[in-house]
């Protein structure tokens, strides 16, 4: 074993061997005994001595040990297989090498250290977003942790003993109210300057946002009515077997939303024909169709220029195709053709170079700066060459396009329903939408930016999607944006994939007649609620919403009541049921009489589907998924996913299943049907609602300063007056804009306060010591399987399986939970911990884990009282 630990330790200590012994004989005997091992001691004189770390390549995380060997008093240690070898990813065998540990060394098999000792980060690692841990967020400013509300028990400790229980409860309720009020005001001050917050609550921004949302909604309504008039919904059913037709309809809606014409809708027919024609080579042919189907000649050339990262075969095919088109255009000069072919050859060779150097490194994310510089140089050269080629070919293009215009042929349809997009995972709350737009506008084909709602658990960071036209080279744009920072925040964009399954199905029980009728009722109610909330059918934006008693102007709801009322033959049933017998029309059912067949009513389904399509296209609400897609007009796919009915259930269904489905579905729809919640006047006053007049008075008073007798100053302008009434008059006359700002600030705060669903910091509950029965985390059967991130602050980590009982056990810290029971089957010394509920932790046994044969023997006086501090 040339590189074992024992051999290496002996080599390190060899230079001290002669100094340790005064007996020459013993020294000679030692050297004679070990002479075979050390006869090549000149081994390291001729070359540079290897560092100690190189001997540990097989286990880099081991701690360096320089302790003397223990061969004086005990027999030589056997070279045993170490239990942590080959188990680096196993939490049971990896020692305590977690990111939380302060030491950073190897495995420690002493007493488990509590996590709260000095040197450990105060904020736990798992609280931060993953990008912060990986370094995508530039600086993590944790700031002061928010205060935690006291429990009633903690609050009682701060009260005098003379306070009775009723008074204590009253004071605690007042404390809670004050705490929440203060927390809300702090939150308002912390976020009032951020764009997302102002757009939600500031009076000026709220008005603009509502106007934009209303304009987008009316555009979607026009698209829906246009598609309905042209018969797109006539034979369309929302069933999973009609997925292709549904996708086609959604694409048509998107083309219309993007301002497309009936001519642009022809692209959908062309794509369908291409799919049917080229099924074997579907992927390649789809790409070709997408690139060239609806683009003009100029756009096709930019497309060819952008698709540099295709494989070399395709590059050669493209160049040969270009040559063919040039031949068909007319006989040019031979010299020009030679130059063009030479340039094409150069381009193709550069394409190959870029493919090997650029594409691979982009995918692996490991391109060096020098490579990126050379690539940018190549890109500039290629752009210059492409521009020169364009200038040469312009006259030819004009000649080619003139006969087309003369013939009066229609323009090619545009694929407006297809886009390219980038996804940005972390956008800081202080970055505005306008900044991202101005950054991305520099690149050709930019369309729009969408930002998600901020996430309180991720420090109010947002996700973003930047949409570009389909003709651009999205990977090149993504690469150019990689290292750009906005306000010290790396955007780190990635290419957003196209949606794979745009039509998804739910349970086929939804085809049943009873459920369909119930869905019609719910969908009609939902349409009515959303139309009233957005005032979509109101004549003017300022008009009040229609009362629910009046019929809606929405044509989709016309005569809807005809389908909501179920016709029953009650009189006939009463007459026939008086004898207690069942109606003769219903034959006795085989099997379970409570089961029924799924009954499908095509007429009802057609009515329901029109309502669901209205909800999906106009209000961006996916009925069967019971969710609303927010800001869908700004997303890359303006009509992306829809959920439809699944295939008919093969078996019969019970009446209970139908009722259960209806009940569950109505519960899921309740949040969408509820009116936007706002606090009542009384609750708002309790939470600190501000009065505009009082705030204006406070503003005037604070800006009226007395300098001396009959001498008053207005600090806003620096002018002096003889009395406070003159200062007041001056402020109202000369600083009216400041007064308006105060009123707007009050409205800003009140809008935030009255929103019942206002954003707030995630509530941090104080760590409560769980009882003995709660020592195991739910879902994790054994204490050794408890993840360290879920354990309370300051609690000692559980012992490693196989070493827990043998290690010296520390005292449980104050406030921490009792030591967890040993796992099931701990065996001797524990007397079945799960049955007795009071046994001390025994040695966990596991056949796959090697225990320590030299574990400390545990002795326990069975008559002694329970104590946690024993071996």
Swiss-Prot record:
What are the GO cellular component annotations? cytoplasm; nuclear body; nucleoplasm
* Residues recorded as bearing Phosphotyrosine in the entry: 8
User: What name does this protein carry?
Assistant: Serrate RNA effector molecule homolog
Under the heading PANTHER family, the entry gives: ARSENITE-RESISTANCE PROTEIN 2, SERRATE RNA EFFECTOR MOLECULE HOMOLOG
Q: How does it assemble?
A: Interacts with CASP8AP2, ERBB4, NCBP1/CBP80 and DROSHA. Interacts with LUZP4. Interacts with NCBP2/CBP20 and NCBP3. Interacts with MTREX.
Which stretches are tagged as biased composition: Basic and acidic residues? 8-73, 297-347, 386-411
**Region of interest (Disordered), ranges:** 1-90, 272-411, 574-597, 830-849
Source species, please? Pongo abelii (Sumatran orangutan)
Q: Cite the location of the cross-link Glycyl lysine isopeptide (Lys-Gly) (interchain with G-Cter in SUMO2) from the record.
A: 150
